[in-house]
Amino acid sequence: MLTHSTRRWLAGLGVAGAFVAASASPALAAAKEAPLELGVYFSDTTLATGSEGKIDSPLLFASGPVVVEGLTVTYDYTDLDGTVQVKRDSAGTECESPKAGVLVCTEHFEIGLDEWAFGGLFSVVMTPTAKAADGDTGVLKVTVSAEGLTPASHSAKIRIGEGVDLAAPGEESMLSATPGSKFSAPLTLSNAGETAAKGAVAVFDLDYAIRPDKQYSNCTYEDGRLLTCSFSEVTAPGETRSAAVPYVLGKDTYAPGSDYGYYNWMTPAEFEDFSTYLQAGGYSMGQPGKGSVLTLPTVPSKAAARGFQADTDPMNNWSGMTVKVTGKNGADLVAIGDKLTGKAGDVVTANVGVRNDGPAALDFGRGGSPVTKIDVAVPAGTTAVEVPEVCAPLNGDQQDWENAGKPGAKLYRCYPDIFIGVGEEQTVEIGLRIDKVIPNAEGTVTINAKCECEGFTEDLKPANDVAKILVNAAAGQGGGDGGALPITGQSTGLLAGLGALLLAAGVGGYLVAKRRRTRFVA
């Protein structure tokens, strides 16, 4: 379930998070009892005439967890009628061409698949031939197969277009603001190629704190967040266009600190390919704003023509800003315990976790780490028999993620989301079997664990970082947080598979790199 602004705009347009296979193929989610089915997705792609082409790989998944042998991907590009050549890019994959227009690649090691699509295997380079001309289009049929399973196919649209080189400033804007204050940042486009760029689309990756102060009709928004802006202006070779985009820093921004925002330029055709990819995963591109049109006027340019390219190096398509947040605006995370009753043999459910009492939200989306750790000590006389996958047995400061979700441990460490808003609760349900009735049996919920690990360390009120789990408490015994029963409300849920990243239609790799501020290698 995507609950927080389409999972923070796909966890920052690395589409990090939740392209679940069932989203692209709803039938796969219909019944867990059905036979296992393979699935494959390959992005629509636009190639520039005369260019070296593009490298991409299919997204592979299954309707349930399975380890397969003889995993094979077949690329059938006969429909492209000699305008595109498809060749192996991965040195470790064995490929052969049984006939013209067909490439068959096989992995000889066992491969694990599940509902979470992943890319990187069977990557190919798609190169326009000398025959290719602007306006050519065709279908690349991609089929996945494995021993004992029915093959699955997906047809991707391949188009040939004119080559351009969109570029953004190489340096980020350095800004400063306090929570609740307004500021503006430049949105700049240069044409560093030799062909006029007929329109462009900016795709934004903004931290939660950075919000639009004004809406425009040629931009799209979701839950108050700026997602994209489309421009129809023709940018001549060597020309630069720029606009000042107004923003406001949210009042619930953590301070002091830093927040980041990036934008990436795409041609309209590339953006259409990207949109198709996102829509296949069930993600919203937002709604047009209710304001005037944001224009990109020309400005004095220092851009120089760099030869005929089609954005083959996406690193010159992005730029952004760093906002130094000044002032003081912290957060108080509160442990949530529970109070349970039952007789011997009963299985009772402890709903435990963390609540953010503010005044600031916590956004760890850049690093991808959970906002805190939730350590759960099982009460005496009970056994944990139902444990979610986001909880792992804990031994000292070491969590055993190989046995995540395994019942029977006395101590667990659970991971909440990478973001928590003010007033938001994130809880996990643990089923406890009462083996022996012990009056006032007590367990604990501890957040902000002191460990050599990532997480929040500057809690405003450490005194409420521990709450009790009471089983068969005597009258007058407190439970939950602060002695009261927990406020359950609607949890945003805990993210399983925090490291599940996938490549996004030719832009995901470098966008993930920008979010994590490290180099991404597919």
Predicted regions and their residues:
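Low-complexity, acidic Ser/Thr/Pro-rich repeat tracts that form intrinsically disordered stalk/linker regions
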Residues: 1, 27-53, 60-63, 85-102
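C-terminal membrane-anchoring or membrane-association module
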Residues: 1, 497-522
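C-terminal segment of classical bacterial N-terminal signal peptides
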Residues: 19-28
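Extracellular/luminal low-complexity Ser/Thr/Pro-rich, glycosylation-prone repeat/linker regions
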Residues: 30-35, 62-64, 142-166, 266-330, ...
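A surface/secretory-pathway sequence property marking extracellular, secreted
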Residues: 31-35, 68-112, 199-236, 369-413
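Short beta-strand elements of extracellular/lumenal beta-sandwich folds
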Residues: 38-69, 171-196, 336-370
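Low-complexity, intrinsically disordered segments enriched in Ser/Thr together with acidic residues
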Residues: 108-135, 232-276, 415-444
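Membrane-proximal extracellular "stem/stalk" segments
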Residues: 314-484
